[in-house]
Amino acid sequence: MKIAAIQKLSLIDYPGMISSVIFTQGCNFLCGYCHNPSLVLPQSFGDFVLEADVFDFLKTRIGKIEGVVITGGEPTIQLDLVRLIKKIKALGLSVKLDTNGSNPGMLKKIIDNKLIDFIAMDLKAPLNKYSAICGVNVDIEKIKQSIFYIKNSDIEKQFRITAIKGIHSVEDLDSIKGIIGDNITLQNFKFSGKHIGNSFSKENEFSSKEMDEFRTA
């Protein structure tokens, strides 16, 4: 398993649970606004974290954390993701999976076999703008399939989008709501200076007032 890092404690990544976060290495999207180039760009990859070391740590946290978040990068491109999830569940911990929805076959397998407890899918844009935002040619049918599987699953779920000023509009959000419904978690873009693309700045952040207007539009 290609594990780039582990965050030992998080109070926000798994809603309602104290968790640890496993970051997988590698992604099949190249979203310019991504703030984790070290997880996406091969030339920025660091050394892997040994899976054995991750589980040695998790065993010391039993009774102190309630769950583990598997994020990326994009976890579903990892061929041994199912095995990793099963090992975490064997410790009695809940599992939340973050995904970009590009691998519906893997998601269906995971959902149908009830391997995870929570799934969060990051939506990038209206479907007609997906490839432009993601920096690669995206198979939109796969995105639609993933949305369908997640929406119709009986596990906890979250659809979220990072709103970027100058890129996303109220009309874009309305288009996404037409597919998902109103239950979307809207996150504001935050400029870090460490994005995959070099065309982003503080100007791409919405103000608090603008975000409130965006949410209620």
Indicate residue ranges for each PLM-predicted region.
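Canonical Radical SAM [4Fe-4S] cluster-binding loop centered on the CxxxCxxC motif
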Residues: 14-49
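Short, flexible loop segments at the rims of nucleotide/cofactor-binding pockets, characterized by
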Residues: 44-47, 73-74, 97
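Conserved AdoMet/S-adenosylmethionine-binding subsite of the radical SAM
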Residues: 55-67, 76-203
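Conserved alpha-helical substructure of the radical SAM core
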Residues: 37-68
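Short, charged low-complexity linear segments at domain edges
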Residues: 1-17
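Conserved beta-strand termini and adjacent loop/short-helix elements that scaffold enzyme active sites
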Residues: 6, 187-189, 216-217
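A secondary-structure boundary/capping signal
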Residues: 23, 71-72
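Charged phosphate-binding loop/patch that engages nucleotide di/tri-phosphates or the phosphate backbone
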Residues: 202-217
